[in-house]
Amino acid sequence: MTTTDGSHSLDSSVAHGSVPYGWQRKRLKELCESVQTGPSVRGADRGRTQADGDVPIVLPRDLRGHRVVTEDAEAVPAMPRERAGALERYMLREGDILVARTGTVGRLALVTGEHTGWLYHHGLVRLRLPAQGPAHAAYLAVYLGSEATQNWMRARSAGSVIPSVSTRTLGELPVLLPPATEQQTIGETLAALDEKVRVHSEIARVTGEYRRTLAEALLAGAFTVTP
């Protein structure tokens, strides 16, 4: 069945639709070594940042354009190393996928080597794939970011004030998997386009800031304009 917002079309297409030759139908939990929510931060640890030399924490707001994008070290929350040592199972490694489970449900990022060893916020879910599993991380990341998948997650979000989706529900997400070589090609192609979008968005942002600064200076007579 397809709803007006497409929220159930993913279930229908994966469960009952035709699948191209060589493709597979799987549930997300079948593809992952673990589907794990991040640890809670104790009140005593609040206020510490990466600049203090502690272990930094990825926040939901850091998931932008399928990447982890953090602010200056002084703005990145962190956990004392002595406590972080007991949370090794929560430390990120390259190829992990982070998904926001509260607030803006479905926001996601593919973790790169830059953030290996970081921790992640309890408002995020980490998907860790087995080394020899059937799913390619880059492909799964773009699949999770597709409109149909995002609609599926939003439709299953609970809470009228702050939407949230459970790890159990997320694990039931239906996934279509092409052969490994196709997964790699699809993932790399769309990831390259995501990077182009990110770069152009940054250019637009910087240009906008320059325009505002220049306009204020010109309108205040800070520069002499020659016709």
Task: Show the residue positions of the predicted features.
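Short, surface-exposed loop/turn microsegments at beta-strand edges and helix-strand junctions
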Residues: 46-55, 70-77, 90-92, 110-123
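Glycine- and charge-enriched low-complexity intrinsically disordered segments
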Residues: 132-159
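A short glycine-rich beta-alpha junction/loop motif
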Residues: 118-123, 159-185
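Non-catalytic DNA-recognition/assembly elements of restriction-modification systems
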Residues: 1-45, 179-227
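Short, charged/polar surface micro-motifs in flexible loops or helix N-caps
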Residues: 63-66, 84, 97, 104-106, ...
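Short hydrophobic-aromatic micro-motifs
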Residues: 56-59, 92, 98-100
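Sequence-specific dsDNA recognition surfaces
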Residues: 29-45, 62-94
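A short beta-sheet element
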Residues: 101-142
